[in-house]
Amino acid sequence: MTKKAIIPAGTTKPIAPFVPGSMADGVLYVSGTLPFDKDNNVVHVGDATAQTRHVLETIKSVVETAGGTMDDVTFNMIMIRDWADYAKVNEVYAEYFAGEKPARYCIQCGLVKPEALIEIASIAHIG
């Protein structure tokens, strides 16, 4: 097995020892992605719609850096702080996965920063 770190240009420097994506044997694992700017500050505070879009754009960047598209995403793990944001998250999510939908789960939980309303981790099969 060959493992390769996937780090898009201009990516936020992680606050822990991990990379945005890791590719092995055609499978891309995208780390839990939060609505952070380049300095690890939460963006769009209080706006679940904008935070979801920011997170999915970041995931898209990782997938594209690995040579794939969002159509290659086969699984998403979604964590939201407040279940009241579920419909907003789904509305934005549907924009990024308009065709064949990936499998997923969604849970409500606390996140690493209190201003963060969403975190998504993904798996994609590329090639």
From Swiss-Prot:
It is an enzyme of class 3 (hydrolase). InterPro entries: RutC, RutC-like_sf, YjgF/YER057c/UK114. Its EC number is 3.5.-.-. It catalyses: (Z)-3-aminoacrylate + H2O + H(+) = 3-oxopropanoate + NH4(+). One of its GO terms (biological process) is nitrogen utilization. It comes from the Bacteria. One of its GO terms (molecular function) is deaminase activity. Involved in pyrimidine catabolism. Catalyzes the deamination of 3-aminoacrylate to malonic semialdehyde, a reaction that can also occur spontaneously. RutC may facilitate the reaction and modulate the metabolic fitness, rather than catalyzing essential functions. Belongs to the RutC family. This is 3-aminoacrylate deaminase RutC.
